[in-house]
Amino acid sequence: MSELIDDFATIYPFPPKPAALTEGEKAGLRDNIARLLKACNAVIVAHYYTDPEIQALAEATGGCVADSLEMARFGSSHPATTLLVAGVRFMGETAKILSPEKTVLMPTLHAECSLDLGCPEAEFSAFCDAHPDRTVVVYANTSAAVKARADWVVTSSIAVELIDHLDSLGEKIIWAPDRHLGRYVQKQTGADMLCWQSACIVHDEFKTQALRRMKRLYPDAAVLVHPESPQAVVDLADVVGSTSQLIQAAKTLKQQQMIVATDRGIFYKMQQACPEKNLLEAPTAGEGATCRSCAHCPWMAMNGLKAIAAGLERGGVEHDIRVDEAVRQRALVPLDRMLSFAADLKRC
């Protein structure tokens, strides 16, 4: 498999950690948010990697906690006229692409994703132009502009199936932006894939030496790994899968202990799925490495109660997701293909 860049060495300016709130302040904000959601005919669409209190709030107010594929489905089908997307910016853009008639708000427009940042539209478009014989498949963790350049958009939950399908048609692939997920998919399918070389700052921090030590401490534990992790970490896994697939695995596996190599935000829904099991965070390189926050995305952490309340109260340029209409229409094509393909998989 060819590679575009040899090393992933970008250091991103991470946001400051949100200020701590008292329990009284949190209760007041939750009440205010519930009132604002009703007043705005809004619903919260939250990702598994947001903080547990945000996921609980989404559930309590009739919203959704899900992976990026289910977030897209939920937002486009829900009758609310306003979507409050608790996640990172590409998730808000995806919601707007699929639901242009709705107001899409985010707690902050500064919640980034290293995969998105690591795949600028101009450079990626030039790369695609240099390989016109290849089908362009981009991960959901990309900007609207990059999606608009793609033939397909895909999430980790259906990546192997989609690439296997395209490979069966004899198509050669450009894959972007996650290098680890790309390598995993290529290994599973044998497809001819030319991969962009970005990575998730959280999953890139999981290390084999530390994971082996933890496996020795918990020899009966199952190891669950997200495929955005380095290949050597994936090789130590009992189960490799997307967020929703890892939650399902934790529920169905016979082991009572799970070592989980993904963002620790997933533990909220995973523990709901298997309350009797012991969930353990897989070790990372730790604070001081490229991931400041030890298996928790610092941009996901920006989706706090104060920021959600501010988004609903103010809206406007600080919170309102806007996508150029020409870009939106082009990006809608590969997104619709993804949703149709995923629906076909469900029917099989």
UniProtKB/Swiss-Prot annotation:
Cofactor field: [4Fe-4S] cluster
Binding-site positions, iminosuccinate: 47, 68, 139-141, 156, 226-228, 243
Gene Ontology MF annotations: 4 iron, 4 sulfur cluster binding; metal ion binding; quinolinate synthetase A activity
Binding-site residues for [4Fe-4S] cluster, renumbered to this chain: 113, 200, 297
Record-listed E.C. numbers: 2.5.1.72
Protein's pathway: Cofactor biosynthesis; NAD(+) biosynthesis; quinolinate from iminoaspartate: step 1/1
Major localization listed first in the record, in broad terms: cytoplasm
Single GO BP term: 'de novo' NAD biosynthetic process from L-aspartate
Localization per Swiss-Prot or TrEMBL: Cytoplasm
Top-level enzyme category: transferase
GO CC annotation: cytosol
Catalytic activity annotation: iminosuccinate + dihydroxyacetone phosphate = quinolinate + phosphate + 2 H2O + H(+)
Family stated for the protein in its record: Belongs to the quinolinate synthase family. Type 1 subfamily.
Function comment: Catalyzes the condensation of iminoaspartate with dihydroxyacetone phosphate to form quinolinate.
The protein's name: Quinolinate synthase
Species of the source: Sodalis glossinidius (strain morsitans)
